Amino acid sequence: MYSPGAGSGAAGERKLCLLSLLLIGALGCAICHGNPVDDICIAKPRDIPVNPLCIYRSPGKKATEEDGSEQKVPEATNRRVWELSKANSRFATNFYQHLADSKNDNDNIFLSPLSISTAFAMTKLGACNDTLKQLMEVFKFDTISEKTSDQIHFFFAKLNCRLYRKANKSSDLVSANRLFGDKSLTFNESYQDVSEVVYGAKLQPLDFKENPEQSRVTINNWVANKTEGRIKDVIPQGAINELTALVLVNTIYFKGLWKSKFSPENTRKEPFYKVDGQSCPVPMMYQEGKFKYRRVAEGTQVLELPFKGDDITMVLILPKPEKSLAKVEQELTPELLQEWLDELSETMLVVHMPRFRTEDGFSLKEQLQDMGLIDLFSPEKSQLPGIVAGGRDDLYVSDAFHKAFLEVNEEGSEAAASTSVVITGRSLNPNRVTFKANRPFLVLIREVALNTIIFMGRVANPCVN
């Protein structure tokens, strides 16, 4: 949340608050009404003038960039868009590890690192000095070679187009952004324009000062609508008050149909073995067929299940029973994950996977501070002069919230159930490899061409919901 700095003057002065709310659902590319940019997806850099108050250029090439600089850029992909996708993946694994360290090993985790990056990229539009530098470093935007902080927004627009504007509509991947600002404030015109053109985030005025509770209800209703009712009351009572000036909301909703569905007739209750040694019954789905698979270091199994259309997949990472999932989480890096994915090959498998749903919500503040995003949350140090007109420098982020939802079931393609994998009854074929997710595992949902991690999480206890 954005708030005025301590040196801003009188007690009770207005504060500017940012809430970053992240969900799973259906998404569309930024559509800008009443803007000279007719189609952001075919626009050139000169068509989208991004003129923030401050610009940051990385002092030198990062070692992490050098590590992957020789990798082949996907076909018909701008190199900088590809590097942005890689930067988002670096942030994803780094943030996930910080979050996992703060959680109990028996807790489920689910988040959209892409949604978090998007929300803070919009915040970066108004940042200066060390606040801008820390945003560039923590979110790994500084690993994009030879480009400045203002150009990141153009690449985000192109990345969003690649992710959300698909010819294949068999899977719903939808993102929505909105700025809710207090009607008594005048917001920087450039900040509003770029937020709308690049991120599709229109500014909606609300009366936080006189009607904070009604404003909270309005925002929660907007979030519920954009997530098909999956996320409700995301902003708790009291989070918005008469001092609030701005609430930034980002939502992502995903619903995918399996390319090869699990037959409900093959689902049966089986035990799931939790970290604490206890077990609980879960509906365990089952199918046999060819999937991309690999047994990697120390017996960890990696399985990729495609959604219809093949452009988005779910990746499951299952340690062997003798190795804890926490150990795999600690060792995971973007480079190691990419190595595992590159090694996947078509394998005849017997797949056992629990049917489950999970919802996770938490504050982002503590983890981001631990990662080095210090000034943004400090009333004394934050520099966000590019958000409110007049360049006022008394704004800071008091908190940011994330919420995500995932449901996995047997559903496959609605009209094309006859896919390349034939579903059979349960068997004991000794010649087929078994992938049985009856113990804690990692789950990722990614876009294949750019290897963009859209969602990431841990299923440690599928019995809770």
UniProtKB/Swiss-Prot annotation:
GO biological process: blood coagulation; regulation of blood coagulation
A GO-annotated cellular component: collagen-containing extracellular matrix
SUPFAM superfamilies reported in the protein's UniProt record: Serpins
UniProt: heparin binding residues: 82, 162, 178
Keywords assigned by UniProt, alphabetized: Blood coagulation, Disulfide bond, Glycoprotein, Hemostasis, Heparin-binding, Phosphoprotein, Protease inhibitor, Secreted, Serine protease inhibitor, Signal
Positions annotated with a glycan in the UniProt record: 129, 168, 188, 225
Positions carrying Phosphoserine: 69
Location of Phosphothreonine modifications: 64
Secretion signal span: 1-32
Record's protein name: Antithrombin-III
Tissues with expression: Plasma.
GO molecular function, one term: identical protein binding
Site residues, Reactive bond: 426-427
